[in-house]
Amino acid sequence: MARILLAEDDDNLRPFLARSLENAGHEVLAFSDGDEALPALHAAEFDILISDLVMPGMNGIELARHAREKAPDLPVIFITGFSAVAMEALNTVDGVSKVLSKPFHLNSLVEAVRNALEDRALS
């Protein structure tokens, strides 16, 4: 089981992702944007960050940078509807484990979480 910080501004997708990850055995704290997630990031330890790239206020790239300052080996998974933005994220943030383009299959996210956690355990 992993403790996951989820930041997603889509009010329909966020609870669906959180429930699905919880059903896969993970503990999920879900927030609507980076600004809302940042205090939780500083207050608690997480095993993985899953974040939308484009959100109001603090975007996913900025949130990931804050997360990596606190925990340099924290796996980061980005989800986005913009493939060009996804490529930019891969080039600007160290330690990105996966970028998933919306729409994606839930199994892809669960597998990305599992792979990121396994990679972290091996390093």
Residue ranges and their predicted role:
Residues 62, 82-100, 107, 111-114:
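Alpha4 helix (beta4-alpha4-beta5 surface) of REC/receiver domains from two-component response regulators
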Residues 33, 59-63:
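Acidic catalytic/metal-coordinating carboxylates
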Residues 25-32, 40:
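Short hydrophobic/Thr-rich beta-strand motif most characteristic of the beta2 strand and flanking loop
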Residues 52:
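Active-site residues of response regulator receiver
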Residues 15-23:
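Charged docking surfaces used in two-component/phosphorelay signaling
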Residues 8:
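Conserved acidic carboxylate
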Residues 55:
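Receiver (REC) domain active-site loop signature in two-component systems and cognate sites
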